[in-house]
């Protein structure tokens, strides 16, 4: 078998939707977690520097920010593992379909995973059962754990609902920073508004970031414009936008996983057709 033919057969058996969704998931989670972590740090610095001089005013906010940062660490680890498992599930379903319908030209891992459902080749002969390849044995063990694609569909569905909440929450800081940036634009170009520059403010207390008794709690006029021109504000704003984009990419990947797994499972269990994802 030539190299090109071997590569072509490998590509034919690859679950392309799962591969794309896995790459999108890793990219989105990395963007969301990395940029979100740094954006929270930047927010903490902005609050400490410009919006409150009393540590007790933002002590609770700092605790919340640190808690979210720890959650980000766990989220990155979880999605790295779960994305890999969903990719394995894609190979699993593909291998099972091809095994059931007589196409044995799958990868070693695909055969090992599919063997847990189909029973696989037993290798009977004079020497008894053949000795399995080490990688195939590992995949068979993994396949026993992945042998319930319907449960993976359910877990992914629940995870998608949960991530919808995370996606919505990631839009909140973007909204706050965008409003602040819009106010700064009105200050920089006073002809666009009829309000007095001194009355144009960004109030952190209004969004619940600081308690109402925090002082000063808000920044107005030219002082606010100078904050918007700092690299800290601009970087934090763009980091939150990047985190929002990462959350959106992760949501798309989860939807792709769920649709592909649902369709694949239906084909495998109900329709009996060798379609793969």
UniProtKB/Swiss-Prot annotation:
InterPro entries: Myelin_PLP (IPR001614), Myelin_PLP_CS (IPR018237)
GO terms for biological process, alphabetical: axon development; central nervous system myelination
Ranges in coiled-coil conformation: none
TM helices/strands, residue ranges: 11-36, 60-88, 152-178, 239-268
Intracellular or extracellular location(s): Cell membrane
Pfam family, one: Myelin_PLP
Residues linked to a lipid group, O-palmitoyl threonine type: 199
GO molecular function: structural constituent of myelin sheath
Stretches in topological domain Extracellular: 37-59, 179-238
Cytoplasmic side: 2-10, 89-151, 269-277
Top-rank lineage group of the source organism: Eukaryota
S-palmitoyl cysteine: lipidated positions: 6-7, 10, 109, 139, 141
Keyword Membrane: yes
Similarity comment: family membership: Belongs to the myelin proteolipid protein family.
Name used for this protein in its record: Myelin proteolipid protein
